Amino acid sequence: MQNHDLESIKQAALIEYEVREQGSSIVLDSNISKEPLEFIIGTNQIIAGLEKAVLKAQIGEWEEVVIAPEEAYGVYESSYLQEVPRDQFEGIELEKGMSVFGQTEDNQTIQAIIKDFSATHVMVDYNHPLAGKTLAFRFKVLGFREVSEEEILASHHGGGTGCCGGHGGHGGKKGGGCGCSCSHG
């Protein structure tokens, strides 16, 4: 076992992975046979449950881990549903399940899903698309590398709340994936 200490590590991990909802055969996201996912350990660039599993894994061996919602994208919160006036979506051809993007008061990009709509109102869901889901990951650690102080600082200011860590966009991710398949609805 690797048994790395989260607080003392200044390394990036490189992994291949695929993820399914537990009990399903449908792959939600995968980078197998593509560019590895690289993330800086301890900077919330991926979900907590997967990071913990990576730190315990043997390099070069396929591992499997089931991650509860609390260690993934959180439990589904009905309070994250919001009804807004339809005119806020003027010029947009709405479809149930489509992803839309907006900005928070502090200018962070946020993804939401159109749950339902009428002629006057739209029901928007701000939960992550995988909130409330138990996820089954199959992954292989390809290796670790030392990271510079600049990379660590950049991860905290640019991509530290990315898709896998903070329910936002794909900031700071290398390889175009992060294990969450944010584009699905």
UniProtKB/Swiss-Prot annotation:
Enzyme Commission no: 5.2.1.8
Annotated segments matching region PPIase first part: 1-74
Pfam families: FKBP_C
Segments forming domain PPIase FKBP-type: 1-99
Database matches in InterPro entries: PPIase_dom_sf, PPIase_FKBP_dom, SlpA/SlyD-like_ins_sf
Region: PPIase second part, residue numbers: 134-156
Annotated binding of Ni(2+), by residue: C163, C164, C178
UniProt cross-references to SUPFAM superfamilies, sorted A to Z: FKBP-like
Disulfide bond annotation, renumbered to this chain: none
Domain of life: Bacteria
GO MF annotations, alphabetized: metal ion binding; peptidyl-prolyl cis-trans isomerase activity
Localization, UniProt: Cytoplasm
Cellular component aspect of the GO annotation: cytosol
Span list, region IF-chaperone: 81-125
Main location: cytoplasm
Keywords: Chaperone, Cytoplasm, Isomerase, Metal-binding, Nickel, Rotamase
Reactions catalysed, as given in the entry: [protein]-peptidylproline (omega=180) = [protein]-peptidylproline (omega=0)
Physiological role: Folding helper with both chaperone and peptidyl-prolyl cis-trans isomerase (PPIase) activities. Chaperone activity prevents aggregation of unfolded or partially folded proteins and promotes their correct folding. PPIases catalyze the cis-trans isomerization of Xaa-Pro bonds of peptides, which accelerates slow steps of protein folding and thus shortens the lifetime of intermediates. Both strategies lower the concentration of intermediates and increase the productivity and yield of the folding reaction. Also involved in hydrogenase metallocenter assembly, probably by participating in the nickel insertion step. This function in hydrogenase biosynthesis requires chaperone activity and the presence of the metal-binding domain, but not PPIase activity.
Similarity annotation: Belongs to the FKBP-type PPIase family.
Domain notes: The N-terminal region consists of two globular folded domains that contain prolyl isomerase and chaperone activities.
UniProt protein name: FKBP-type peptidyl-prolyl cis-trans isomerase SlyD
